Amino acid sequence: GFFAFIPKIISSPLFKTLLSAVGSALSSSGEQE
């Protein structure tokens, strides 16, 4: 089913790039407060 694709999505370079971008955005917004 759908859940079989989750490990592939998580291990994909694009997901890691997106995750790091979101993480840096969250940390930067947290510093502003």
From Swiss-Prot:
UniProt GO MF annotations: toxin activity
Origin superkingdom: Eukaryota
Any GO BP annotation: monoatomic ion transport
Subcellular location(s) per record: Secreted; Target cell membrane
GO cellular component entries: extracellular region; membrane; other organism cell membrane
Keyword terms, alphabetized: Ion transport, Membrane, Secreted, Target cell membrane, Target membrane, Toxin, Transmembrane, Transport
Pfam name, any one: Pardaxin
InterPro entries, sorted: Pardaxin
This protein's domain notes: Consists of a C-terminal hydrophilic region and a predominantly hydrophobic remainder.
Subunit structure and binding partners: In aqueous solution exists as a tetramer.
General function of this protein: Exhibits unusual shark repellent and surfactant properties. Forms voltage-dependent, ion-permeable channels in membranes. At high concentration causes cell membrane lysis.
Family: Belongs to the pardaxin family.
Name assigned to this protein: Pardaxin P-3
